[in-house]
Design a protein with these regions (language model features):
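Structural signature of extracellular appendage/secretion-system components
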Residues: 1-264
Length: 264
């Protein structure tokens, strides 16, 4: 038995070394425990316990809490920077200058209402201002389309990761059904999928007694429950200036507007 335990420990060490660069992998550890004595009371030596993961639940929970905030600030900062560029006055031809010259042309016309050059200047500055508004509108529309495109990509990623977690729930539950084995690598893969989810949206998760993880996004919408995965759908709605709205679709096609989760 001692030889068997040592052999298993060596295999586990090799597994740890082989996966040191695997994203989400947790180091594994073989523990030995006292074997039950025989009927005469003679000790049975040692037995290997199920291989466990060296894993800190507190650290994992903090990662899930902080990751979406980091992603939100990064994304928001990126788009605010693009909006700032659209409204920029650094090149001397921004909206502020166009407005000033437009009102100045009207002021000159009010002082010389019969002047043909003054009238022409009003027309020229009106055209310049209108052109500036059209250009800004086009840029903002392009930015809106970029945001919608990213939201569509995010929806697809969330759905794929939710499906992955549900499938791993099923596999883990099947593997650990007898209570004698722990699906360490599958659990690592599931944790990594949930961590990847946290980069896209605010996530909370908890594990039930059967080893299956429930995943909640936002404050209270269930994405994964046991072996079941629900999904997100994006669609355009009127009155939203062309912005994509996101629905959570659960059992019996029950829908809930989750757009705020991705805009907060």
């Amino acid at each position: 038995r001692a030889l068997s335990i040592n052999q298993r420990a060596m295999q586990t060490v090799g597994h740890n070394i082989a996966n040191q660069g695997t994203e989400g992998f947790s180091r594994q550890h073989v523990r030995s425990g006292t074997s039950a004595p025989d009927p005469t009371g003679v000790g049975g030596g040692a037995d290997a316990q199920p291989t466990s993961r060296v894993y800190d639940k507190f650290v994992q929970r903090k990662i899930l809490q902080e990751t979406p905030r980091s992603g939100m600030f990064k994304s928001r900062g990126e788009f605010l920077q693009k909006i700032e560029i659209i409204f920029s006055e650094t090149e001397g031809n921004g909206l502020h200058k166009a407005l000033n010259e437009f009102w100045n042309s009207w002021s000159q016309l009010s002082n010389q209402p019969e002047s043909e050059p003054a009238r022409m200047q009003v027309k020229v500055q009106s055209d310049v201002l209108a052109s500036r508004f059209r250009g800004m509108h086009s840029q903002l529309k392009g930015l809106r389309n970029e945001i919608n495109g990213r939201l569509v990509a995010t929806i697809n990623q969330v759905n794929e990761l939710g499906q992955k977690v549900a499938e791993l729930n099923k596999q883990i539950n099947s593997f650990e059904g007898g209570g004698q084995r722990i699906a360490n690598d599958m659990r690592d893969a599931r944790n990594q999928a949930i961590e990847d989810l946290s980069e896209l949206v605010d996530v909370n998760s908890f594990e039930d007694p059967n080893g299956r993880t429930t995943v909640i996004i936002g404050r209270d919408w269930t994405l994964v429950e046991g072996n079941n995965r629900y999904q997100l759908e994006g669609k355009m709605k009127g009155g939203e200036l062309g912005m994509l709205n996101i629905d959570g679709v659960s059992t019996n096609d029950n829908r809930r507007d989750l757009t705020r989760i991705f805009r907060e």
